[in-house]
């Protein structure tokens, strides 16, 4: 006979969400067009009317959020000279996970002369959520990239904070076939206490990263001109043709405002959904 634990595990697995999106875009006569699109499970991507800047895509999670044991995979390729902007229809909520962690895997490839803007709305981690996220990014030497992520530890708009849980965020970026950036953030256990440390978040509940390629000292100076308007902590550095901005704030609203101020200095066009 199957044990009660085995039956419970089987039911849990059967109720986990799965979703995958895979597509490529290419440019012809200055117009970016989508190639073959593969969608499965509860993850979808929709393409509003074409814009002068290129093609825009909006991810929709029909599962209504992410729970423990869920898995979502995204694989996107922008061929030479293509221009693509991606965002999400809403903030992604990651719920409490009594079992395995949720997995989010994103693979991005950008060709020569192509540009990709990855600008999802914030990811909100509920108390005791567990999620492992992985970015694998491959850039041509002549490609450009704007990759922004905001993570909020708790529903700050409701006065809630994430106290316990697990968040693992792994970024790997190669350029011209060489690994040029690798970082893994691991927060687990008593996350609330760790975020309270001065060397971590100084009590902030929202963190963000903006990776800009190419980026240089001139870009840093333009961003510093906006520093007096920042509501939270913002730091930026540049090296080897990259620029990276780090953000920390008390809540999602303040952090988003700071990130928008930084992006305005880069000349980036924000998705309309960010402005609603």
UniProtKB/Swiss-Prot annotation:
Alphabetic keyword roster: Chaperone, Cytoplasm, Nickel insertion
UniProt-annotated location(s): Cytoplasm
Name under which the protein is recorded: Urease accessory protein UreD
Major subcellular location class: cytoplasm
Organism: Bradyrhizobium diazoefficiens (strain JCM 10833 / BCRC 13528 / IAM 13628 / NBRC 14792 / USDA 110)
Subunit structure: UreD, UreF and UreG form a complex that acts as a GTP-hydrolysis-dependent molecular chaperone, activating the urease apoprotein by helping to assemble the nickel containing metallocenter of UreC. The UreE protein probably delivers the nickel.
InterPro entries: UreD (IPR002669)
GO MF, any single term: nickel cation binding
């Amino acid at each position: 006979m199957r044990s009660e634990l085995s039956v419970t595990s089987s039911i849990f697995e059967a109720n986990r969400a799965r979703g995958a999106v895979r597509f490529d875009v290419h440019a012809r006569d200055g117009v970016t067009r989508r190639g073959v699109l593969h969608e499965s499970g509860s993850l979808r991507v929709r393409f509003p009317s074409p814009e002068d800047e290129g093609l825009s895509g909006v991810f929709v999670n029909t599962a209504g959020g992410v729970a423990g044991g869920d898995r979502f995979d995204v694989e996107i390729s922008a061929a030479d000279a293509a221009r693509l902007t991606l965002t999400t229809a809403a903030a992604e909520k990651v719920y409490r996970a009594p079992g395995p962690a949720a997995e989010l895997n994103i693979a991005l490839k950008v060709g020569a002369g192509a540009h990709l803007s990855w600008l999802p709305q914030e990811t909100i981690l509920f108390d005791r959520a567990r999620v492992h996220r992985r970015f694998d990014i491959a850039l041509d030497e002549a490609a450009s990239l704007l990759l922004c992520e905001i993570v909020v530890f708790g529903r700050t708009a409701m006065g809630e904070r994430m106290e316990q849980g697990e968040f693992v965020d792994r970024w790997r970026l190669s350029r011209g076939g060489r690994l040029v950036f690798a970082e893994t953030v691991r927060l687990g256990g008593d996350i609330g206490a760790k975020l309270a440390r001065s060397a971590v978040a100084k009590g902030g509940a929202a963190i963000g990263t903006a990776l800009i390629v190419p980026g240089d000292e001139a870009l840093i100076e333009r961003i510093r001109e906006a520093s007096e308007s920042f509501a939270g902590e913002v730091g930026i550095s540049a090296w080897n043709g990259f620029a990276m901005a780090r953000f920390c704030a008390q809540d999602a609203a303040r952090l988003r405002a700071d990130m928008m101020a930084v992006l305005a200095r880069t000349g980036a066009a924000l998705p309309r959904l960010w402005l609603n």
